[in-house]
């Protein structure tokens, strides 16, 4: 590509994202047109409220220690912080859940598909050929996954031909992310095989057809999952109810608040175990000044212990 061609191409791209590569093929009869993605600096700009370090692709890197802390949280604790901040569109439900007893936590790696359109596909195929891109299709995105990622895929609710993975690729995702997880507004296949792989997944349906008649249009861009706008690098939290997508700038506060709630619950139950108090004397906060002082001291001691332990991990 000449310098002039490069300038013309960049000028044609929307300010929200830039084209960095085009179509990838599978060995079957269909192709994927792609791809819009954030250049690293744009991704940093759109997630500038996060103070965390950055992954090589520019996503906020919620620390591994915080990901582990989040596994002990409840959905109510996640929601409380989001609601307080006014982020009321961060929850998606209505999924089928693989391994429903296993909490899913990780950093969002987002992928977007759209229904295939031939004239768009033709241009994308030509650009892919110019750039010498491999014929990988959905695997192009999957091969970019890193440890700690959760693969978050907008497949516009597609069931037939909307299967982002079968058991082989699901196993690869598990290995690449170290068991992070999968959220897809679409379907999966080989459900019997998936059930034998120890990684949580949230999906709309299972279907025997391979993925097809779609275009891969975005990697690490904002995607829609249900009524949620998911940003690359969001903390993904999945439980028995559904999936929460937490902006990184709220993660530390959310975890600190959860620690305080856990300690409060711990102290409350200890006092109940003593058999000396009525519930109204202890829950939700102690009424007696001496008990209030005891609780404050207990809270400080336990939080110091928790944070010291986390610092050693």
What are these regions (language model features)?
Residues 1-15:
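N-terminal secretory signal peptides that target proteins for export/translocation
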Residues 34-79, 85:
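N-terminal pre-domain segments of enzymes
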Residues 16-29:
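Bacterial N-terminal signal peptides
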Residues 73-77, 82-232, 245-277, 281-313:
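Feature captures the catalytic cores and cofactor-binding loops of soluble hydro-lyases/lyases
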Residues 58, 173, 234-236:
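Buried hydrophobic positions in well-ordered alpha/beta secondary-structure cores of metabolic enzymes
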């Amino acid at each position: 590509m000449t310098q002039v061609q490069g300038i013309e191409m960049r000028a044609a791209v929307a300010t929200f994202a830039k084209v960095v590569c085009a179509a990838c093929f599978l060995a079957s009869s269909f192709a994927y047109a792609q791809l819009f993605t954030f250049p690293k600096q744009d991704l940093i700009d759109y997630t500038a409220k996060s103070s965390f370090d950055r992954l090589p692709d520019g996503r906020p890197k919620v620390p591994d220690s915080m990901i582990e802390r989040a596994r002990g949280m409840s959905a109510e604790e996640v929601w409380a912080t989001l609601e307080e901040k006014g982020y009321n569109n961060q929850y998606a439900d209505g999924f089928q859940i693989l391994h429903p007893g296993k909490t899913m936590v990780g950093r969002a790696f987002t992928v977007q598909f759209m229904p295939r359109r031939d004239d768009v596909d033709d241009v994308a195929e030509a650009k892919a050929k110019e750039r010498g891109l491999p014929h990988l299709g959905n695997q192009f995105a999957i091969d970019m996954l890193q440890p700690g990622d959760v693969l978050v895929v907008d497949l516009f609710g597609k069931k037939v031909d909307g299967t982002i993975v079968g058991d082989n690729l699901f196993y690869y995702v598990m290995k690449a992310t170290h068991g992070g997880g999968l959220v897809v507004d679409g379907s999966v296949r080989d459900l019997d095989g998936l059930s034998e792989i120890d990684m949580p997944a949230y999906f709309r349906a299972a279907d025997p057809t391979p993925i097809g008649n779609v275009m891969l249009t975005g990697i690490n861009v904002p995607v829609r999952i249900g009524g949620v706008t998911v940003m690359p690098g969001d903390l993904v939290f999945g439980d028995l109810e559904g999936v929460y997508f937490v902006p990184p700038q709220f993660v530390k506060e959310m975890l600190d608040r959860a620690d305080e709630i856990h300690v409060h619950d711990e102290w409350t139950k200890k006092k109940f175990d003593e058999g000396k108090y009525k519930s109204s004397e202890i829950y939700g906060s102690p009424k007696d000044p001496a008990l209030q002082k005891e609780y404050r001291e207990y809270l400080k001691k336990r939080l110091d212990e928790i944070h010291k332990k986390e610092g050693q991990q």
